[in-house]
């Protein structure tokens, strides 16, 4: 009789309602979207956002950051020489980007580097005209959790792709646990209340009843990622219903049926949920929204709902990559970068060369001027199994029956699903999701109008931590 391997499943659910109260209220008032209360045993004290306080009743800061962030936790280290095993080019870029950055910012630089590579892997698997949407911080967090239980070559592959090894090699003061501690700090920095936006995250760890998980693994994911191991029966249809109700609650009723079915052989599931709602600093007047042409390619044009506003916006023109960059700010220190190639054919080059260095170059070369901005409304709903994309990036043993996950369980365990699901809505109210030099750049001094009428990239950053929250491509605004 052939032995069937134990399965590990990772599921990430992302909801980004970019500022839009329109549509959100309607959906929340929909009687078909009732959110039944969850039994106590289903969701224990396992996340920093477990207890949802009604809007308007939040404390100014529901976390005691003074205890969590000691004075020396986020200081600027002197960068030591990197390991000679690193390539000179890679080491130089890492050192250059790390200069003047806090530890959390350095971690997020490498998280973004991983995200851009993952984006390219997903793009290579998709149709050229497909929209793309991912939440890098959720993916990095889930992989960070799993890496706590990996050993040998399996561990090395994951750490290499996530660039954790580059981080450790950058300073003699850094070690692997430094990274996990920074993920803990990052969670507390990001998911706070009353910053003018809503950003929530939940990490859940479900374990099949009677399946033995190492106590040290459970302790570490609890300490660094706030995930308390919870017993579950994956063969019971009631589990899927309960999990979906939980996701429905976390995402304010906007993501339904996230889990359609679970393989009965699954022994462990990691569920990461992120919800974001932000409001533009410069809103788009609803009465200004109008039908406008959007060029899909050299031959096809579609009509889109084009929003329009006027105000002071940061923007730059990158002559090297032949694109325009606009920063749209949300209330509270989060912003969306809109990147539009000059030519329709320029998207491939832009996607291929997108790096943290390029983004930093854009941000440091922007000028603040009064501009008229035209941006299409869009809503993206994407669902990915990231396994093949991660394999193409070099993470192969994690999804192989011979992968070493002995730090999770003494019994054999393998992973065959890494689910990533997200939704982002952008409307008039907001969203409801190289060397520093001016060479090759020029201010948009003569361009009074910034019109987004062709496929574009978007990147959502939290500025204090330099965290890339969301990114994607809008190839066709009328499709999800």
From Swiss-Prot:
The keyword Glycoprotein is assigned to this record: yes
GO biological process: blood coagulation
GO molecular function: heparin binding; serine-type endopeptidase inhibitor activity
Region (2 X 11 AA approximate repeats, Asp/Glu-rich (acidic) (hirudin-like)): 56-80
InterPro entries tied to this protein: HCII_serpin_dom (IPR033831), Serpin_CS (IPR023795), Serpin_dom (IPR023796), Serpin_fam (IPR000215), Serpin_sf (IPR036186), Serpin_sf_1 (IPR042178), Serpin_sf_2 (IPR042185)
Residue stretches spanning the membrane: none
Site (Reactive bond): 444-445
Domain remarks in the Swiss-Prot or TrEMBL record: The N-terminal acidic repeat region mediates, in part, the glycosaminoglycan-accelerated thrombin inhibition.
Sequence repeats: 56-66, 70-80
Stretches for region Glycosaminoglycan-binding site: 173-193
The keyword Nuclease appears for this protein: no
Modified sites of kind Sulfotyrosine: 62, 75
Carbohydrate-modified residues: 32, 169, 368, 404
Job of this protein: Thrombin inhibitor activated by the glycosaminoglycans, heparin or dermatan sulfate. In the presence of the latter, HC-II becomes the predominant thrombin inhibitor in place of antithrombin III (AT).
Signal peptide region: 1-19
Keywords for this protein: Blood coagulation, Glycoprotein, Hemostasis, Heparin-binding, Protease inhibitor, Repeat, Serine protease inhibitor, Signal, Sulfation
Modification(s) after translation: N-glycosylated; different glycan composition appears to lead to two forms of this protein (56 and 60 kDa).
One Pfam family this sequence matches: Serpin
UniProt similarity note: Belongs to the serpin family.
GO annotations of cellular component type: extracellular space
Official protein name in the record: Heparin cofactor 2
């Amino acid at each position: 009789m052939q032995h069937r391997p134990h399965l590990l499943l990772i599921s990430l659910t992302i909801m980004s309602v970019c500022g839009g109260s329109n549509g959100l209220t309607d959906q929340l008032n929909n009687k078909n979207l009732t959110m039944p209360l969850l039994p106590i045993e289903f969701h224990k004290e396992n996340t920093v956002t477990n207890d949802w306080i009604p809007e308007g009743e939040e404390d100014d800061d529901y976390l005691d950051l003074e205890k969590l962030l000691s004075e020396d936790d986020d200081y600027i280290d002197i960068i030591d020489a990197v390991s000679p095993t690193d390539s000179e080019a890679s080491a130089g870029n890492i050192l250059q980007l790390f200069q003047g950055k806090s530890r959390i910012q350095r971690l997020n630089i490498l998280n973004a580097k991983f995200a851009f590579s993952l984006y390219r892997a997903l793009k290579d698997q998709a149709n050229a005209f497909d929209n793309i949407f991912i939440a890098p911080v959720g993916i990095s967090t889930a992989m960070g959790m799993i890496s706590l239980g990996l050993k040998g070559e399996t561990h090395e592959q994951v750490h290499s792709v996530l660039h954790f090894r580059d981080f450790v090699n950058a300073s003699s003061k850094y070690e692997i646990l430094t990274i996990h501690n920074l993920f803990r700090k990052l969670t507390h920095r990001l998911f706070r209340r009353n910053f003018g936006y809503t950003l929530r995250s939940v990490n859940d760890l479900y374990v099949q009843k009677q399946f033995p998980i190492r106590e040290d693994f459970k302790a570490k994911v609890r300490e660094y990622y706030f995930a308390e191991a919870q017993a579950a029966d994956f063969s019971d249809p009631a589990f899927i219903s309960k999990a979906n109700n939980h996701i429905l609650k976390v995402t304010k009723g906007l993501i339904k049926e996230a889990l359609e079915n679970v393989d009965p052989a699954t022994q462990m599931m990691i569920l990461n949920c992120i919800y974001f709602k932000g409001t533009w600093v410069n809103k788009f007047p609803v009465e200004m929204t109008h039908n406008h042409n959007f060029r899909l390619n050299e031959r096809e044009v579609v009509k889109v709902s084009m929003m329009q506003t006027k105000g002071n916006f940061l923007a730059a023109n990158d002559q090297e990559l032949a694109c325009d960059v606009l920063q749209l700010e949300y209330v509270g220190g989060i912003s969306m970068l809109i990147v539009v190639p000059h030519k329709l054919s320029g998207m491939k080059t832009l996607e291929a060369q997108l790096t943290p260095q390029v983004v930093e170059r854009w941000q440091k070369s922007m000028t603040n001027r009064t501009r008229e901005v035209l941006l299409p409304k869009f809503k993206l709903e994407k669902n990915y199994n990231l396994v093949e994309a991660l394999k193409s990036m070099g993470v192969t043993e994690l999804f192989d029956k011979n992968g070493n996950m002995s730090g999770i369980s003494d019994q054999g365990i393998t992973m065959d699903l890494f689910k990533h699901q997200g939704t982002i809505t952008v409307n008039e109210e907001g969203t409801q999701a190289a060397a520093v030099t001016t060479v090759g750049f020029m201010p948009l001094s003569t361009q009074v109008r910034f019109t987004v009428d062709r496929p574009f990239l978007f990147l959502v950053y939290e500025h204090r931590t330099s965290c890339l929250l969301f990114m994607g491509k809008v190839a066709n605004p009328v499709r999800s």
